[in-house]
């Protein structure tokens, strides 16, 4: 019983209706290409219509729906369009995100609000938008892209890590409420992935992987029906072990490892 998949495994993508929000670059673009190659019916959303259009060759049948995840009315309008076009949505992936490496003394109101709006409030509003139709059908899946930065406090992740920690909590609570109603909930917690966002980092990123590798890990986790899909394991397992340390030891170790 303990080994039973927590979610319904997704193994056959042919004709599966997937709305990917945050599809223009990095993990989102790589996942869009991987899903298109497996026959999924795609709707791709991001703020940049130009970057979405650049995916047209890899995803020629995809519906392109430019939007800003922080604008609830835009998400709702796109959702209504998809319901009218498809009749339902099988999986919504909330991948839109923003990141600024900040120390505590660099905090400002604009950075706080932007990060929370994109990384947390936008996905929460998005779930509130898509959920009623899924509940009416008694089927569907929601995937939220978090981060291992949400496991515990880390230097330079004061806003980003906080938003991802809250998103992980949100995903866990969603699962408890929705699994009995036939809705699958996945939380995807990557380590370091080579993307335009992580290109801002001026420090060595352990176990750095490509966006294509990340997309493959996500598909493998969905196929296993895992609640939490975390990768690369050689890094994320270490981060999970650090969750068990008492704070005195954790703080000391992180200072030594980061040199901060």
Residue ranges of model-derived segments:
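Substrate-binding pocket helix/loop in short-chain dehydrogenase/reductase
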Residues: 103-105, 111-116
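Active-site helix of classical SDR
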Residues: 127, 163
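Conserved glycine-rich Rossmann-like NAD(P)H-binding loop of the short-chain dehydrogenase/reductase
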Residues: 38-55
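C-terminal helical subdomain
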Residues: 187, 203-238
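Conserved glycine-rich cofactor-binding loop
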Residues: 24-25
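Rossmann-fold cofactor-recognition segment
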Residues: 59-73
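Residue(s) in the substrate-gating loop at a strand-loop-helix junction
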Residues: 147
């Amino acid at each position: 019983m303990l080994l039973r998949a927590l979610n319904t495994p997704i193994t056959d993508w042919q004709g599966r209706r997937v709305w990917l929000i945050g599809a223009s670059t990095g993990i989102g673009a790589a996942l869009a290409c991987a899903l298109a190659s497996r026959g999924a019916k795609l709707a791709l959303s991001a703020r940049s219509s130009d970057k979405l259009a650049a995916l047209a060759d890899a995803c020629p049948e995809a519906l392109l729906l430019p939007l800003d995840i922080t604008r609830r009315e835009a998400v709702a309008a796109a959702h209504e369009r998809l319901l009218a076009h498809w009749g339902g949505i099988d999986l919504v992936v909330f991948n839109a995100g923003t990141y600024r490496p900040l120390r505590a003394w660099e905090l400002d109101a604009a950075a706080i609000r932007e990060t929370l709006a994109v990384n947390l409030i936008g996905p929460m509003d998005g779930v509130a938008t898509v959920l009623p139709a899924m509940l009416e059908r008694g089927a569907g899946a929601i995937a939220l892209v978090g981060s291992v930065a949400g496991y515990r406090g880390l230097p330079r992740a004061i806003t980003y890590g906080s938003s991802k920690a809250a998103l992980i909590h949100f995903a866990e609570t969603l699962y408890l409420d929705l699994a009995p109603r036939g809705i699958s909930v996945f939380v995807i917690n990557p380590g370091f992935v080579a993307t335009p966002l992580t290109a801002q980092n001026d420090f060595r990123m352990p176990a750095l992987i490509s966006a294509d590798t990340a997309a493959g890990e996500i598909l493998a986790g969905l196929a296993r029906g895992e609640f939490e899909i975390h990768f690369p394991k050689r890094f994320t397992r270490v981060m999970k072990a650090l969750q068990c340390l008492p704070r005195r030891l954790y703080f000391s170790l992180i200072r030594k490892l980061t040199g901060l």
